[in-house]
Curated annotation (Swiss-Prot):
Functional note: Catalyzes the conversion of 1-hydroxy-2-methyl-2-(E)-butenyl 4-diphosphate (HMBPP) into a mixture of isopentenyl diphosphate (IPP) and dimethylallyl diphosphate (DMAPP). Acts in the terminal step of the DOXP/MEP pathway for isoprenoid precursor biosynthesis.
EC assignment: 1.17.7.4
Enzyme class, first EC level, given as a word: oxidoreductase
Pathway listed: Isoprenoid biosynthesis; dimethylallyl diphosphate biosynthesis; dimethylallyl diphosphate from (2E)-4-hydroxy-3-methylbutenyl diphosphate: step 1/1; Isoprenoid biosynthesis; isopentenyl diphosphate biosynthesis via DXP pathway; isopentenyl diphosphate from 1-deoxy-D-xylulose 5-phosphate: step 6/6
Stored NCBIfam families: ispH_lytB, PRK01045.1-2, PRK01045.1-4
Entry binding sites for (2E)-4-hydroxy-3-methylbut-2-enyl diphosphate: H41, H74, H124, T167, S225, S226, N227, S269
GO biological process, one term: terpenoid biosynthetic process
Residues that bind [4Fe-4S] cluster: C12, C96, C197
Gene that this sequence comes from: ispH
Cofactor(s), names only, from the UniProt record: [4Fe-4S] cluster
UniProt name for this protein: 4-hydroxy-3-methylbut-2-enyl diphosphate reductase
Cofactor note text: Binds 1 [4Fe-4S] cluster per subunit.
Source organism per UniProt: Haemophilus ducreyi (strain 35000HP / ATCC 700724)
Residues annotated as the enzyme's active site: E126 (proton donor)
This protein's UniProt keywords: 4Fe-4S, Iron, Iron-sulfur, Isoprene biosynthesis, Metal-binding, Oxidoreductase
Amino acid sequence: MNILLANPRGFCAGVDRAISIVELALEVHGAPIYVRHEVVHNRFVVDDLKAKGAIFVEELDEVPDSAIVIFSAHGVSQAVRQEAKRRGLKVFDATCPLVTKVHMQVARASKKGTKAILIGHQGHPEVIGTMGQYYNEQAGIFLVETVEDIANLPIHHHEDLTFMTQTTLSVDDTSGMIEALKNKYPAIQGPRKNDICYATTNRQQAVRELAKQAQLVLVVGSKNSSNSNRLAELASRMGVLAKLIDGPQDILPEWLDNVETIGITAGASAPEILVQSVVAHLQTLGATSVANLVGCEENMVFEVPKELRVREVK
């Protein structure tokens, strides 16, 4: 039984930055540091930061006045920012810069009075934050999850219209949605290329290559991780048994029946230590070789806030 590792896999630049912001804030200011929502969607990462003194909350009313709070990588609405300012909270913003780019697109549409359509998953923190950048009551922003949602949009063809997407979607699904939007609204405007982030795109391409050679694909990532779920779905669509796991403890021996090659990848919020723990566990179950697929190199780095960067240099 062989193990094949996808490349690239695991942490992206936005996740690296978000985790660094929490760790550096704890180092500079000491515990407790409050974090609104899980800074990234991975249970292992969140538990590790809790042990270091981070306190995770869902809403700002759980944060004491004048405390330090970090916004998660998924971003927040303008209403949340305004509440933090009103209460005198010191904020470090760990929003992924690629999410911030989408926020700016929405804010521009709102300012111009252009109706906006967001392709995304209802209830996901990134979507909530992105929708919350639109404040023009004379126009509006609409969320669509399916082609059927697009067919039912109550927007006239002659209206000014723009679209944007959640950054962690399936590339294949999103291209079909964009095509449906352009068919219904030929004059619709949008980004020059879709908003799906480089890391999501790269990991989806890597899992395609993995699924061509493996009979089982294990995706290391938490159940609430959008990009991890998309990786498992993509491998499954290619006819391969695919399982989303938090770690080696989730692996069932029967998954390995008649399997010669196991492919392993990890979502953008899953640390490499979890991948290696899965490899080690599979070796105890009979895996004899480990190889890395050749994939694209990622060199993207996002800087942490200046106040924390000074400390980082020291």
